[in-house]
Amino acid sequence: MTITYTSQVANARLGSFSRLLLCWRGSIYKLLYGEFLIFLLCYYIIRFIYRLALTEEQQLMFEKLTLYCDSYIQLIPISFVLGFYVTLVVTRWWNQYENLPWPDRLMSLVSGFVEGKDEQGRLLRRTLIRYANLGNVLILRSVSTAVYKRFPSAQHLVQAGFMTPAEHKQLEKLSLPHNMFWVPWVWFANLSMKAWLGGRIRDPILLQSLLNEMNTLRTQCGHLYAYDWISIPLVYTQVVTVAVYSFFLTCLVGRQFLNPAKAYPGHELDLVVPVFTFLQFFFYVGWLKVAEQLINPFGEDDDDFETNWIVDRNLQVSLLAVDEMHQDLPRMEPDMYWNKPEPQPPYTAASAQFRRASFMGSTFNISLNKEEMEFQPNQEDEEDAHAGIIGRFLGLQSHDHHPPRANSRTKLLWPKRESLLHEGLPKNHKAAKQNVRGQEDNKAWKLKAVDAFKSAPLYQRPGYYSAPQTPLSPTPMFFPLEPSAPSKLHSVTGIDTKDKSLKTVSSGAKKSFELLSESDGALMEHPEVSQVRRKTVEFNLTDMPEIPENHLKEPLEQSPTNIHTTLKDHMDPYWALENRDEAHS
């Protein structure tokens, strides 16, 4: 009963779809012609009464009614209601088709998994697939009127060969007030387990695959049963039907052509045939008829499912697959492309025009000049290199630049990122980082960099262990002058630092300091009074004993209570040097 026109629209040509309008079976004309004739007859009866049977006063009243109906007829949301309803019906129709039980996969598993070419094996395979077909027929006769007319009772199924008399008696013993379409699937599961226990199915994995496919078909049958039971809500169908028919009942009056002599707006013409009203009836009522036909595809309409053909096809194909085709294989031979790495199937003269080369991609044929194919240096790498030069000059490591890779030995000597610029800052690193980033555009960041360099202990400064940055030589090293206010020193354990500063001793002593007097300290704290002498520290590295390898880890592993001092505003580098000297002595 399905109307197939796929071959007629295989090629989009002039008139290919227009020829479909001439079909009668399954067409909209076949569904609509009766109601359209009724609408046409009612329209011309009302027109005849208006023109010939009414008096002038009655005509005036009818004309007012016509204008009123025509002005308010558009308030009915017929397109909105019909659109949602037909979409719901078409979706439901396609889901029912997808749940039609096809035993093709199950018959392949039964033919391959259930072994034995003897009579017992053959009987086992045919019985299993017959149970599957019986379950399909039981559910189809429950939802399809065409299948029910073919098998109106269980006795007809026995006579048709879907069920044996013994199975019919077994089915009648189950006196339940429910549909019995699930019983053959239970028989199938039990018989499959018996076949596995009897050695007909070798592995439990094969049994599981067989039962999974059986459950898939059983689920599809359950879905068909649910679709037949749970329909689209009746109120929705009623609303759509009332909206469509009330719209065209109003059109019978509102779309009448009035007397042009009375000069009503929109009624300048007096046509006998309301063409667009008839077209509107054809479209909207035809739209409703589509939903009425698809709402139950298991009926006897022209476009309903061919359920009886499905029953015949499934039984014939499945029995052939599990019986005659079981282990009936053709002899294996080398194919005609046995030693050809690139097989080329031939084309006929009619299909030679469809031969195409392989598609390699839309950019495969793009050509570039030689200059355009050269790689360009990365701009970010150049900026990072420039920033690295400035950072090396200032003795800092960039926070946005990733350090080079370090091996297992140099990784321990790499200065910590947080100890360089954030030592002595609050523990809220996020606020500290935002403060540093906000002051990068100001000159103050240079002063902070110098202060951070001086505040860090010597062994944690960049270049202390790196020969390219700070060459180890016996030449004196100097520190930049303090650009800001003098630092206030706090007490350090074991040392009295009140009103005193440091002074280096260059005669005799190595790596030692002495305290300056208060006047010398005042000159150093106020460089604008007099020119301050540059302070130098001399290290004698020639007579130092050889340091073991693990000695480099000691400054990083020392407790902060032994080597760190607490300063305000800025840390004095001389105290850091002295602490380092005392810690290593």
Swiss-Prot record:
InterPro entries: Bestrophin, Bestrophin-like. Changing residue 325 to T: In ARB; possible decrease in protein stability; loss of cell membrane localization in transfected MDCK.2 cells; reduced chloride conductance. Changing residue 93 to C: In VMD2; no effect on subcellular location in transfected HEK293T cells; loss of cloride and bicarbonate conductance. Residues 1-31, 83-237, 289-585 are cytoplasmic. Its main location: membrane. It is found in: Cell membrane; Basolateral cell membrane. Changing residue 73 to N: In VMD2; abolishes membrane insertion. The C-terminal auto-inhibitory segment (AS) modulates the open/closed conformation of the channel. In a closed conformation, the C-terminal auto-inhibitory segment constricts the channel concentrically by wrapping around the channel periphery in an inter-protomer manner. To allow chloride movement, the C-terminal auto-inhibitory segment opens partially, leading to significantly smaller chloride movement. This is Bestrophin-1.
